[in-house]
């Protein structure tokens, strides 16, 4: 029996979600360009989802879409849209309007997360408290050391190496400025995504024998490799 030319399978992908809090396309573009410049190896030409939950129907979606695309990001969908007219406008622009998954808690009812206590040296940023879902830690021009757990939905970015001495369930992006010599060290690897200088694996790509284990990731011949951390 001949094989079917197509096959439908369920899968999951880890994408960055950009939450818009301003209706001015120029302001949004400048903010995005700054973010991309901080981590070009990961964000340049990256696929993203745009969340418009905080915006009103008065937004000029065509101009906003052009502003976002001008930064090099690729929009794969729009979430958080409650206004029917805005949904129709987005659909006419050729983008799917995505239904969001179950939220843990309404962000409007959640108090702002306090800044994490940080100790810094010339080449290391140290975080000694848990990194919770929705938090992003960026270690500019240095290594990042986390001595506690990292929740799913949290993001670690470092221009240098990343060390996690706890359960790692979020995303870890080392060598964000393009340094291919950077590494990721983790005592319990259950990450949603790991990346070194823009080369990344999502959760499904991490070899099963290393999941939940102490691991070291680095680049060899331009490809991600992993080995047990003793």
Swiss-Prot record:
Protein keywords: Cell cycle, Cell division, Septation
Disulfide cysteine pairs (residue numbers): none
Pfam families: MinC_C, MinC_N
GO biological process entries: cell morphogenesis; division septum assembly; regulation of cell division; regulation of cell septum assembly
PANTHER family membership: SEPTUM SITE-DETERMINING PROTEIN MINC
Subunit structure: Interacts with MinD and FtsZ.
Family: Belongs to the MinC family.
HAMAP family: MinC
Function, as annotated: Cell division inhibitor that blocks the formation of polar Z ring septums. Rapidly oscillates between the poles of the cell to destabilize FtsZ filaments that have formed before they mature into polar Z rings. Prevents FtsZ polymerization.
UniProt name for this protein: Probable septum site-determining protein MinC
Organism whose genome encodes this protein: Erwinia tasmaniensis (strain DSM 17950 / CFBP 7177 / CIP 109463 / NCPPB 4357 / Et1/99)
Source organism phylogeny: Bacteria, Pseudomonadati, Pseudomonadota, Gammaproteobacteria, Enterobacterales
């Amino acid at each position: 029996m001949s094989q079917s030319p197509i096959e439908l399978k369920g899968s999951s992908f880890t994408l960055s979600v950009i939450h818009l809090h301003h209706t001015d396309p120029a302001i949004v573009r400048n903010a995005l360009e700054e973010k991309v410049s901080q981590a070009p190896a990961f964000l340049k030409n990256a696929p993203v989802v745009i969340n418009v939950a905080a915006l009103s129907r008065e937004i000029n979606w065509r101009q906003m879409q052009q502003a976002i695309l001008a930064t090099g990001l690729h929009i794969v969908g729009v979430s958080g849209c409650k206004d029917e007219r805005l949904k129709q406008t987005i659909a006419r622009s050729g983008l799917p309007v995505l239904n969001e998954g179950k939220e843990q808690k309404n962000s409007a009812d959640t108090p702002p997360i306090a800044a994490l206590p940080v100790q810094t040296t010339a080449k290391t940023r140290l975080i000694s408290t848990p990194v919770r879902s929705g938090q992003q830690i960026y270690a500019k021009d240095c290594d990042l050391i986390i001595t506690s757990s990292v929740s799913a939905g949290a993001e670690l970015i470092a221009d240098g190496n990343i060390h996690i001495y706890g359960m790692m369930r979020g995303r870890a992006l080392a060598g964000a400025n393009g340094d291919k010599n950077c590494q990721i060290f983790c005592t319990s690897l259950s990450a949603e995504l790991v990346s070194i200088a823009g080369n990344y694996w999502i959760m499904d790509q991490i070899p099963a024998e290393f999941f939940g284990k102490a691991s070291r990731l680095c680049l060899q011949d331009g490809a991600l490799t992993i080995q047990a951390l003793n």
